[in-house]
Regions:
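A short beta-loop-alpha structural element at the N-terminal edge
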Residues: 3-15
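Conserved GNAT-fold acetyl-CoA-binding loop/helix
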Residues: 16, 20-43
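Conserved catalytic-core motifs of GNAT/GCN5-like acyltransferases
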Residues: 118-121, 138-144
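Acetyl-CoA-dependent GNAT
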Residues: 33-91, 102
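Conserved GNAT acetyl-CoA-binding A-motif
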Residues: 109-121, 129
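Conserved acetyl-CoA-binding loop-helix of GNAT-fold acetyltransferases
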Residues: 94-108, 129-134
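Active-site acidic-Proline motif in GNAT/NAT acetyltransferases
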Residues: 86-91, 95, 107, 123-124
């Protein structure tokens, strides 16, 4: 069973470890070299549990992934809009955990006052595209 909780500073090393796995695949992030805990500290601290949470996902006490809701575009008109990021440890991928994460987030949105969610997904990341499309998201900005 997956347990969700607000990320604490002591979770940051594992969050960074999972993030760095995605850099190697070139599927999920524009970073091209591994990041450090220090590199992600300001990003971590920008998350507010009441407005822009960062959750960890645990199974049997092990952090297997994380979910971030971040500001979009930084202008007041977008206060009810967030960018979602879901990162899952490579050994736990392709087990339906992304869908569990989507279901969890969907239930949290009303309490956070969020009306619009968007995700930046690389064209090569077909698994993420399918996950979001399956959950009613539309593809925008793709080129032929």
């Amino acid at each position: 069973m997956i347990r969700y909780s607000i990320a604490a500073k002591e979770d940051l090393p594992r969050i960074v470890e999972i993030y760095n796995q995605s850099i190697l695949t070139k599927q999920s992030t524009a970073d091209v070299t591994p990041v450090t805990i220090e590199d992600k500290l300001a990003w971590f601290e920008a998350h507010d549990p009441k407005k822009r949470p960062l959750w960890i996902m645990q199974e049997a006490g092990v952090i297997i992934g994380w979910i971030s809701l971040s500001d979009f575009y930084g202008r007041p008109a977008y206060d009810r809009t967030v960018e979602i990021s879901i990162y899952i440890d490579e050994t736990y991928q392709h087990r339906g955990i992304g869908q569990y994460a989507m279901d969890f987030v969907e239930k949290q949105l009303p309490g956070l006052g969020i009306e619009t969610v968007l995700a930046f997904i690389f064209d090569s990341n077909q698994a993420s595209q399918r996950l979001f499309e399956k959950n009613g998201y539309c593809l925008w900005g793709a080129t032929a």
